[in-house]
Structure formats: C-alpha cells, structure tokens
C-alpha cells in the first residue's frame, strides 16, 4: 500500500463511520450469500427487514374465516379503503373483543419471544450508567453495513445471523487497551477486528490438527493393508491404535450429544467473547446433527467437551442482562487502595477515593445463594457459571466434579525382553552391569558399607597384616598428639576406615610407664657423658687428630634418635596417606 492509499484510508476513517471496511470496499451496497460471493442489486437493510418479517409473520396460507379467499380477507378501514389482511394467530379474537390482550407468537420451545437486541442493549446501557459508567465509556460505537458485509466476506462462512448484525450495529465491542475487565462478567467483548484475529489463530490450530489427524488415518490405513504375520507387528499396531485413541483429538464430545461437531476447533465457530486463557464463547455456524444454526457454544483449551449454552445470541444476552438486574454481580475492589468499597478503611470520610470506585473487575456473585448454594468456594468465573447451568439444563447432576477437559490414561509399558539385557547399551552402562547383582541385597542404590563385602584397594594402598612392625619407643608428647587426632575424627566413619586405622596398634599404643623409665635412664646417661666430655676438653689435643677421633656415645645416640624420628614421621605420613585413600574410596562409594 502506497502513500496515496494510506492517505485515502486515513481520510476514509475520519470522514465515515466505518470501523472495519476499507475506503475502496466493494461491499457497501451489496449483500453476501452463503458461498461468500456478492449479490448485486440487493440492499442489506432490505434483507434484514425481510428476515424480520418472516420471523414474525406466520407461514400459514389458509384462512380459518369463512369466505376467506387464498388465506386473506378484506377489511374496511376508517377512511373506507379496503385492505387485504393475511391470517395471523389471534386475529379473530382481536376483531371480536379489542379490549383484551392479543396473543403472541411462541418460539420453537413453546416459550414467549425474547426481547429484541436493541431492548437488551438499552437495559445494559442503563445498568452501566447506574453501576459502572467507566465500563460503559469503554464500548465502541456501532459498525456500518459496509463493515458487516466486508466482515462476512473475510470470514468466508456465509451469512451471519440477523441478531449478530443487529448486535454489532449498536456497539462494536470494547476498546483495546481499555479497562482490564470485560463487559460480560469479565469476558471481553471482541470487536470485528478482534474476531478476525482470533478466528485466524484458531484456523491455524485447526489446520495443524487436521494434518495430524490425516497422518493418523494414513498410518492406520497402511497398517490395515500390511497385516503382519508375526505377533510383534500385531502388538505394535495395537499399541499405535491405543495411542491414537488416547489422544485428545479422538476424544472430542459435546453436551447435548451430536449438537456440536466433534472437533477441537472448527472454521464454522466464530468467537466473540474470550477469557484470555484459551477459552472462547462462539457462534456456531456449522452445528452437528442435533444442533441449531447460530447456537452459542463454549470451546477452547479447557473444553474438550463442548457445551451449548444458548440457542441464539438473544437468549444468551437475555441471561446476562437478567444476572445484572438480579444483582448477581460484584465489582472487585481489591486492587484499589482506599476505594469506596475497600474493607480496610476505618475512617468516616467516604468521599476519599470515590473517583476510583468503578475501576475493579466485574465478576459473577450468587447474591442470594439460591442457584448454587453454599457449594461455591471462592469466585466462580462466568464460564464456569454458564457451564454448570448448561449441565443442569441437560440433566447432569454432578456439576462440581464434571470435567470438560480430557485426561489421557496411562498406557502400560511393555516389559523388556530377556535379550534386551545383553544389548550393548545395557552392557556398557555400569548401573545395569554392576547394580543388578546387588538388587536383592539392599534397595539402596548406594554401596552398603556395613555389609561384609570389602572394597578392593590398589596394591599400593594394601597393608599386609602378616608384616610385624618392630616396636620402637615413642615419646609421651607424640602419643598425646596421636590420641588427640584420633579423638577429633568423626564418629560416622565406615568400617573400612576403622580397619585401616586399627592395623597399626603397635605403633601407637605404648605403655606410658615404660616410656618414663627409659627417658630417666637416658637423661642420667647423658649427664655422665657430658661430665666426661668436659674432662677430656681440658687436656690439650692436636688439631690434626681431631678428625680421626671416633664418635662419642652421645653423638651416636643423637644420630639414632634423629633416625628414629625420621622413621616415625615416614610411618605417620604413610598412615595419613592410607587414611586419605580410604576417605576417597568412601566418597566414591557414596
């Protein structure tokens, strides 16, 4: 579209009352037939008048008045002119006694006719002006005939019901981005553009589901043509059939039965109300064998079982208006701080916040608790209210536990064959190779450290129990340090760690009394040797013979002590290494 076309459409939008039709719409002065093509020379308003006339005038062509000719009679008016009057119910009684009320035409169910769309809109507007004026300001103006004609052509579903055309000629839904609540108890009333957008989304969903259903049917046909001779192929086909039957596509139902076509979405369903959760209220232009053209249904994400909630738009809007006039509504004020209906207010100044009074959400409330009683816990959405009313109308008593969404059943898993245990995947996996042998011993998948089995250690970390470590004297300070480290260890050690530590009792456990005696003897010997050294130092010695002198006893003992200390350090390091290896193995096992 070029700049000129954009300018023309802008001028068209500000100079005309069209909401949906374009500036060059070819449907301004033409009607649309059932196929979606235009019929020239016809006017939409004349077609509406004709349909209204056919809806009110009885189709009988025979007169019950004697002397009637071709179902009509001649009557004289006050000015003396004669008029031909066709037969209507109540005509004879109206002529005989004009003071009584005339009889009314009844609908197909034997009920009196419903109010017209215009009268219903008048009642809605009066309620909005009194209770919720801001929501009334949120409504669009009515559409034109050109809008409706182009809308019908874009849908491609044939002619719309007369009630729909009258309904949208009064108001074209709600403003986009207006109040956060919908007109119909929280359900947003879509305009013509919104209907086209929702219809396009559901058309894509329907197209994808049709492809999936076609693939399922094609696979079933192939399996029927290729009837397998082996039992394995038969089990596969049976499992595939169960999978198809367990999907939501094959479990679409309706209440009453056969009133709605068993599809998840259909091109003949025109949504005009939505709850922004994937559920819609729509006009059904392609009903089932037991349905009626133009009936109002609920379909969507939570409704695998579709419901017929009204036979036409007039009946649906009449129920909504009745709820408003009976007081079965509530304007939620929880989001407004200091509002007129806020329960947290304790002051007496009710003028504060009155401007924010009508900013909440419009929702349903059973005022006198006659319809649902005390069974309602929390708020009921209007879709849930319509659902329960429809179920009650069609004789379903268990209203609260009835679910309209399909829940697939759990399919039994086939047991693995014996040959499957030897498969390369199972053989390579450590969980299938090592863990299967110990399944009967313990249910815990971790290694049971308290069992009698021992974990194999590497050769470098094995300790030979036959080797005897020579007893060596250990100092008292070293014994205390070893005892302190042993006491600081956690109590939750495994038996492997305890066994490794207990293999060295001879090195750690030495009697304290023997150590004290040995230390006293060593100290006495050292004192004697020191005295002898002082005596020897007084005698002159040559510097040349100093290097050739043999080592004294004290020097030898000092060297032996150093060697012993080095050996003890090496042994302690070995025990520490063994403990670290045991802890690492325990961590790996856990």
Curated annotation (Swiss-Prot):
Transmembrane segments: none annotated. GO terms for biological process: fungal-type cell wall beta-glucan biosynthetic process. InterPro entries: Knr4/Smi1, Knr4/Smi1-like_dom, Knr4/Smi1-like_sf, KNR4/SMI1_regulator. Pfam families: SMI1_KNR4. Residues 470-481, 489-515 have a biased composition (Basic and acidic residues). Residues 217-226 have a biased composition (Low complexity). Residues 516-528, 576-590 have a biased composition (Acidic residues). It comes from the Eukaryota. Residues 554-568 have a biased composition (Basic residues). One of its GO terms (cellular component) is mating projection tip. Belongs to the KNR4/SMI1 family. This is KNR4/SMI1 homolog 2. It comes from Debaryomyces hansenii (strain ATCC 36239 / CBS 767 / BCRC 21394 / JCM 1990 / NBRC 0083 / IGC 2968).
